Design a protein with these regions (language model features):
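Alpha-helical residues within the helix-turn-helix
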Residues: 23, 34, 68
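Short amphipathic recognition helices of helix-turn-helix/homeodomain-type DNA-binding modules
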Residues: 65, 76-84
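Short amphipathic alpha-helical segment with a characteristic S/N-K-E followed by hydrophobic residues
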Residues: 57-58, 70, 77
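A short, Lys/Arg-rich alpha-helix, primarily the initiator
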Residues: 1-25
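Residue-level detection of the helix-turn-helix DNA-binding "recognition helix"
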Residues: 19, 23, 37-38, 53, ...
Length: 84
């Protein structure tokens, strides 16, 4: 997939973090889509791309599924620590 050419949007606060975590774990977007499906989130490649680019809002159930698929806590995904 080619790199994003437009600047990120401002519709959500987790898109950039999802990309960074996914890339740190060496998970391709296609593989991440499959992983999301295994945790119960059926999302299209376009929708995931828009989420990662911060061009769409994120639903609460999507946050839960993304955290589960990345094997991290919701707090870590949101950038918050438990004692903040």
């Amino acid at each position: 997939m080619k790199p994003r050419q437009n600047p990120p949007g401002n519709k959500n606060m987790i898109g950039a973090k999802v990309v960074a975590l996914r890339k740190a774990k060496k998970i391709k977007q296609k593989d991440f889509l499959a992983k999301l499906q295994t945790v119960g989130l059926d999302i299209s490649a376009t929708s995931l791309s828009r989420l990662e680019g911060q061009y769409r809002l994120v639903q609460d159930y999507e946050i839960v599924a993304i955290a589960k698929a990345l094997d991290i806590s919701i707090e870590d995904l949101l950038g918050k620590r438990r004692n903040d």
